[in-house]
């Protein structure tokens, strides 16, 4: 499918870790927010993870963020502004990890807390 063809081009796949997978692409020309290029639940999430892994696209486990992105953002759309900070943390880590793999200097620390507003979490705050 066209969606699966987009996965190898993604910068990161954010997972839940098994039920949801959301592939994001950020064009670093600074003209917009990261976009959801693929997303899936259960079997489709597994396929997205497998295609990502086969193409060296980093997988990043962040359950509340994965659920929020999966539930709120359509494929091909930019992420909403109030999820930008959380996604930026993940992308910054992914880019630092790539640099680490190339240079073997200063392994980055994965972010562990994400500011996901209550209305995206799908639970009662």
Predicted features, each with a name:
Residues 1-66, 71:
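Helical hairpin unit composed of two closely spaced alpha helices linked by a short loop
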Residues 1-4, 14, 76, 94-101:
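Short secondary-structure junctions and interdomain/linker hinges
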């Amino acid at each position: 499918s066209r969606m699966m063809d987009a996965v190898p081009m993604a910068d990161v796949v954010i997972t839940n870790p098994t039920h949801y997978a959301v592939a994001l692409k950020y064009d670093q020309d600074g003209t917009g927010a990261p976009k959801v290029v693929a997303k899936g639940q259960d079997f489709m999430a597994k396929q997205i993870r497998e295609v990502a892994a086969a193409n060296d696209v980093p997988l990043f486990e962040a359950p509340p963020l994965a659920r929020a992105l999966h539930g709120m953002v359509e494929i091909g759309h930019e992420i909403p502004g109030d999820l930008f900070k959380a996604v930026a943390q993940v992308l910054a880590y992914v880019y630092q990890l790539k640099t680490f793999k190339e240079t073997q200097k200063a392994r980055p620390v994965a972010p562990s807390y994400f500011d996901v507003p209550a209305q995206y979490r799908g639970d009662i705050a």
